[in-house]
Curated annotation (Swiss-Prot):
Biological source species: Legionella pneumophila (strain Paris)
Keyword Ribonucleoprotein: no
NCBIfam families from the UniProt entry: cyoE_ctaB, PRK04375.1-2
Keyword terms, alphabetized: Cell inner membrane, Cell membrane, Heme biosynthesis, Membrane, Transferase, Transmembrane, Transmembrane helix
Domain of life: Bacteria
Underlying gene: cyoE
Subcellular location: Cell inner membrane
Organism taxonomic ancestry: Bacteria, Pseudomonadati, Pseudomonadota, Gammaproteobacteria, Legionellales
Name recorded for this polypeptide: Protoheme IX farnesyltransferase
Entry similarity comment: Belongs to the UbiA prenyltransferase family. Protoheme IX farnesyltransferase subfamily.
């Protein structure tokens, strides 16, 4: 009854903002900016930055809105997501779909007209990968959903790079590899904390299918791997000592959280690990940017 009543209420503009998952998109756009500046020997045109961020941001918002739409039944079961606009009934399925299509087309148009076709194509593939392949299939099909689907979420720095150069580059793929390796421990920590909700929603996250302790072990192993991968920019002379120091400090700190999580039964530690993983990625890319210019 509550959902039916909510559906009759006027839609607030903030509901549409929420559909775009702004906090997730902002973190993603940070990696886009870093990708752009790392690709440039000097400074990047503010005009190019503006159109790139706006275009990719709109497409990311479109993918997020489709995620809200497809996952509305799952979201209504989970405490963390039950009050999302579509799940709660504040935004109808039709409204969410039209919103996603419109801003997605706007974003792609901006990229084609003012950035370059390669970036537009890669952004479109990323949108389909996240909204279609991951949300529409992988999330419900396999416990490795975020490992496979994480490739779409790891693409933003590559998009920023191609926006500047108009071509693919091995160094840009290294940035993708960092985020790709970061994704499993990030999401699995949340999945441990929200274990019961994922179980009730019948989503085959790793803690649900293989147990919490097995998931903790995988978080530990992936965090070790992430520490190694994060040092590769220095190894290939893509970055210098400032980045190396930052990557080591952040990586060791992340490993401390993974170690603590492995040896405790307190759910709050899983959430603390999840939150630190966000800070880790943000600061790691800031170190990349600072190191590039200093």
């Amino acid at each position: 009854m509550r959902t039916e009543y909510a559906a009759r209420l006027p839609v607030d503009w903030r509901d549409y903002v929420e559909l775009c998952k702004p906090r997730v998109v902002l973190l993603m756009l940070l990696t886009v900016i870093v990708g752009m500046y790392l690709a440039a020997p000097g400074w990047v045109s503010l005009r190019l930055i503006a159109f790139t961020l706006l275009g990719i941001g709109l497409c990311a918002g479109s993918a997020a809105a489709i995620n809200h739409l497809v996952d509305r039944h799952i979201d209504s079961i989970m405490a963390r997501t039950k009050k999302r606009p579509v799940a709660y009934g504040r935004v109808s399925v039709k409204q969410a779909l039209w919103f996603a299509v419109i801003i997605g087309l706007m974003g792609l148009s901006l990229l084609i007209l003012f950035v370059n076709q390669l970036t537009a194509l890669l952004t479109f593939v990323t949108l389909i990968g996240y909204a279609g392949v991951y949300t529409g299939y992988l999330k419900r099909a396999t416990s490795q959903n975020i490992v496979i689907g994480g490739l779409a979420g790891a693409a933003p720095p590559l998009l920023g790079w191609t926006a500047v150069t108009g071509q693919l580059d091995p160094q840009a793929l290294l940035l993708v590899l960092i985020i790709f390796t970061w994704t499993p421990p990030h999401f699995w920590a949340l999945a441990i904390y929200r274990y019961k909700e994922y179980q009730d929603a019948e989503i085959p996250m790793l803690p649900v299918t293989h147990g919490i302790q097995f998931t903790k072990l995988n978080i530990y192993l992936y965090t070790v791997l992430l520490l190694v991968v994060s040092l590769l920019p220095f190894v290939v002379s893509m970055s210098g000592w400032i980045y190396l120091l930052g990557a080591l400090v952040l990586g060791i700190r992340f490993l401390v959280w993974a170690h603590k999580l492995y040896f405790t039964d307190k759910p709050v530690v899983a959430m603390q690990t999840f939150r630190f993983s966000i800070l880790y990625l943000m600061l790691l890319f800031v170190f990349l940017l600072v190191d590039h210019y200093f």
